A protein has these predicted regions:
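Extended beta-solenoid/beta-helix repeat architectures
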Residues: 6-112
Length: 112
């Protein structure tokens, strides 16, 4: 299952087709195009907040990552607050906490 839920405007949505529709209408095409499982997502102030799940592949454009596994893909920008960054390319962003695997290709990282 791709999504567990999406919370937007205080409303929880669990229907995958409805979630895709909401993400597209809010300009988050990159999230719809990515491959992941069991995603727990919230949108607040036009920002994606990834609460949990497994990111399999795709390009993370921006947002706040709170928990879960980033298994492969490209991280363009955002704040990584916790979880596991296992593989892929880190272009830019802030790494606050969690595990950054040694085989991740890192271009620019700010640790806070």
């Amino acid at each position: 299952m791709k999504y567990r839920y999406l919370i937007i405007g205080g409303k929880e949505i669990i229907n995958p087709k409805e979630i895709d529709k909401v993400l597209i209408s809010n300009g988050f095409y990159w999230l719809v195009d990515a491959e992941f499982e069991e995603a727990e997502i919230e949108i607040e102030n036009n920002t994606v907040i990834w609460k949990g799940g497994i990111w399999l592949y795709g390009t993370w454009n921006y947002g706040i990552w709170q928990n879960g596994e980033f298994r492969s893909g490209k991280w363009l920008n955002g704040i990584f607050e916790g979880g596991e960054f296992l593989n892929g390319t880190w272009e830019s962003g802030i790494f606050k906490d969690g595990n950054l695997n040694d085989n991740v290709k890192v271009n620019v990282i700010n640790k806070k």
